[in-house]
UniProtKB/Swiss-Prot annotation:
<dbReference type="InterPro" id="IPR006310">
    <property type="entry name" value="DinG"/>
</dbReference>
<dbReference type="InterPro" id="IPR013520">
    <property type="entry name" value="Exonuclease_RNaseT/DNA_pol3"/>
</dbReference>
<comment type="subunit">
    <text>Monomer in solution.</text>
</comment>
<dbReference type="GO" id="GO:0016818">
    <property type="term" value="F:hydrolase activity, acting on acid anhydrides, in phosphorus-containing anhydrides"/>
</dbReference>
<feature type="domain" description="Helicase C-terminal">
    <location>
        <begin position="703"/>
        <end position="893"/>
    </location>
</feature>
<keyword id="KW-0067">ATP-binding</keyword>
<dbReference type="Pfam" id="PF13307">
    <property type="entry name" value="Helicase_C_2"/>
</dbReference>
<dbReference type="InterPro" id="IPR012337">
    <property type="entry name" value="RNaseH-like_sf"/>
</dbReference>
<dbReference type="GO" id="GO:0005524">
    <property type="term" value="F:ATP binding"/>
</dbReference>
<dbReference type="InterPro" id="IPR014013">
    <property type="entry name" value="Helic_SF1/SF2_ATP-bd_DinG/Rad3"/>
</dbReference>
<dbReference type="GO" id="GO:0008408">
    <property type="term" value="F:3'-5' exonuclease activity"/>
</dbReference>
<keyword id="KW-0378">Hydrolase</keyword>
<keyword id="KW-0269">Exonuclease</keyword>
<dbReference type="GO" id="GO:0045004">
    <property type="term" value="P:DNA replication proofreading"/>
</dbReference>
<dbReference type="GO" id="GO:0004386">
    <property type="term" value="F:helicase activity"/>
</dbReference>
<dbReference type="GO" id="GO:0003887">
    <property type="term" value="F:DNA-directed DNA polymerase activity"/>
</dbReference>
<dbReference type="InterPro" id="IPR036397">
    <property type="entry name" value="RNaseH_sf"/>
</dbReference>
Amino acid sequence: MGMATYAVVDLETTGNQLDFDDIIQIGITFVRNNQIIDTYHSMIRTNLEIPPFIQALTSIEENMLQQAPYFNQVAEEIYDKIKDCIFVAHNVDFDLNFIKKAFKDCNIQYRPKKVIDTLEIFKIAFPTDKSYQLSELAEAHGITLANAHRADEDAATTAKLMILAFEKFEKLPLDTLKQLYYLSKQLKYDLYDIFFEMVRQYDAKPLDKSYEKFEQIIYRKQVDFKKPTTNYNGSLKSLYSKAVDQLGLTYRPQQLYLAETILDQLMHSEKAMIEASLGSGKSLAYLLAALMYNIETGKHVMISTNTKLLQSQLLEKDIPAMNEALNFKINALLIKSKSDYISLGLISQILKDDTSNYEVNILKMQLLIWITETPSGDIQELNLKGGQKMYFDQKIETYVPARHDVHYYNFIKRNAQNIQIGITNHAHLIHSDVENSIYQLFDDCIVDEAHRLPDYALNQVTNELSYADIKYQLGLIGKNENEKLLKAIDQLEKQRILEKLDIAPIDIFGLKASMNEIHELNEQLFSTIFTIINDSDVYDDDIHRFHNVFTFETKDILKDLHAIIDKLNKTLEIFNGISHKTVKSLRKQLLYLKDKFKNIEQSLKAGHTSFISIKNLSQKSTIRLYVKDYAVKDVLTKQVLEKFKSLIFISGTLKFNHSFDAFKQLFNKDVHFNTFEVNTSLQSAKNTSVFIPSDVASYQYKNIDEYVASIVSYIIEYTTITSSKCLVLFTSYKMMHMVQDMLNELPEFEDYVVLTQQQNQNYKIVQQFNNFDKAILLGTSTFFEGFDFQANGIKCVMIAKLPFMNKHNAKYWLMDSEFTSTFKEYVLPDAVTRFRQGLGRLIRNENDRGIIVSFDDRLINSNYKNFFEQTLENYRQKKGDIQQFGKLLRQIQKKKK
């Protein structure tokens, strides 16, 4: 890297408006030769007020700046320190523009010769990181950042991460480094100089044996699993005893019974349903049972989970902990569908693509580094989003496999027999088909959180036609010979003429005209759907924030679909007899579009259940058309029930009305199930109270203000008495945001953090909620389950309404045809299950004490109240007004002490 000096700068300011706001703190960390050699830090005085938000974010208050210098008093000193350095910052435009403006106000012209953005560096160096926010990068890479948004600490942290990135680059194979150098020329900043120096100073040596080469790609060699050699002659009971002892867990006879029950069902190839109480530690039980089954029979077990979070917990936490506790080496692997794994031929094609797009260029560099690291080739490791994901998905769709391609899915297949425990999720379990032969290698399966299977099956059987997706897919082809795939075809035709290639002539002008007509026909199709929406009854789905049309005539839609399919067929005829790879890519894209339209057309003609969804009633671009192709019961029967010899469904909430019948009826085949109820929980009924307010008016949809005000009053009463955190669960965003707005305006909550559910941010919000002592979390259906509520004081879960799906919910509409009485057989069991899951958020260990507040009087006044009351049999129940609620809180608080 030479002896260049990097000035890693971080600024805190009064805001982000360059012409108005001021710098209030500057931190600089100087780096040379991958070593921190110096630091500089100063508070900066300003005559502007520091907004409360900035004070809260930075912990910098106005009195801290009283003795600090103004920028013009330290400008010369700072300039002298950084003038000959490479200027570095995280999101560099912000810091660079602010400091240049500050220098300019002091009559100093600052123009760094080279500029580096660490956001760019970190995206390339750490391609699998979930976030590139500085605090989350620091946590992911083991760097302590005690005070985020303080300039000195942020600058030092950025510098340490930059050093890690540079060291990682320097260890890469030379061919990879050279490709990064060439690609870096297309970046926004001066990273190419850094890569050039690394290439120039590279100590040439043979390629390390841990790597192999495919075309121009250096990739990490895949190491096959060794056949398991678990030497154990004891019983499951002794295995369980050793595990809980070494892991520091409580010995629970019922947990052992659960493990023994699962093992017995596996050994006898049975099909079983097991309800194991929430907070039971069931994952340890089924992991030990699966391991013991493998030890005794040599057969491996598939475990399907509900979420990626639980998948990760099993693979990265629970199984490694078992390995250490038992001194075993358990071969466990995440198993997905073939399309979830990378092929090196696809990466090669992406690298050769001449798309001049910044995000695509970053993606190419990420792929080059990722493929030197990944043992699995699991595409989801890359956490692709936005334009990168759309580009990548399109490349997968149009990829024509290269000769001698290296596909990582084949590694999974090759090692399947040596895997003791396979981990998958419900979506992959249901989606797997004949091509995914890895699933056929497992005869035994444990399905955790089995009550969620129908939701994933419904997603699987529902086909979608989206304006945004079709528009994007058409855009990848282009409208003229200067765009995307049409450009490649145009270049091929020119090459055919110049080089006399042995392929038939391509009618470029005809192709261009056809594509323009396809674009127009697509616009016509969605304009027709848009007109139908405007002429129909529209129902709001508040949970998903969409507007739905359930009843509509399909004649005009079918007419437009027929026209666009016909045009696609005629366009495909242009390429008859041409087998060139460029033509194959375009044909594949056109066939993808044709199949999309054709599947929807066939389903609509057959009269399958369908509905139209639109996010914004004034924007055609937000339209989606959904069609249900198959019955959920058929898919669950074929893809799950008939696939395995032994099959164990396990959940904390499988029963409804003291019976497993509601879950059994999700399969349209009369199969005998062994059923078990195992109470392994540490939960004690005396620790938990259910309070039902008597002074809250019944919910009225047209006027919910009074209902919302009552909820807020109870939150005030709870926080005033306990000073503890509270989880409030809603069935609509509208009510959630009404409560949020009221809480934010009340002085009682000035020292509370009010958090609300946000799209794709739930994991982060849960972390924040669990870290704060005084916090209120407002959430919808997502938080009714799969959420570990941590608190030192009293715990409180408030349920605004019973979690019934609205009759205008798309799920209700799609499932209606599968039941004689949809409400009794599907909606009511679903609501009771979700309610039970909500109750399960409260007590997670023997020391927890808490209270559940249910505001919905249907819990005690409806004709179906008995089904909910059954779920509360183990809880102490009390009905009363807000004064009695306060009295109960004080009693619980006294016991807690």
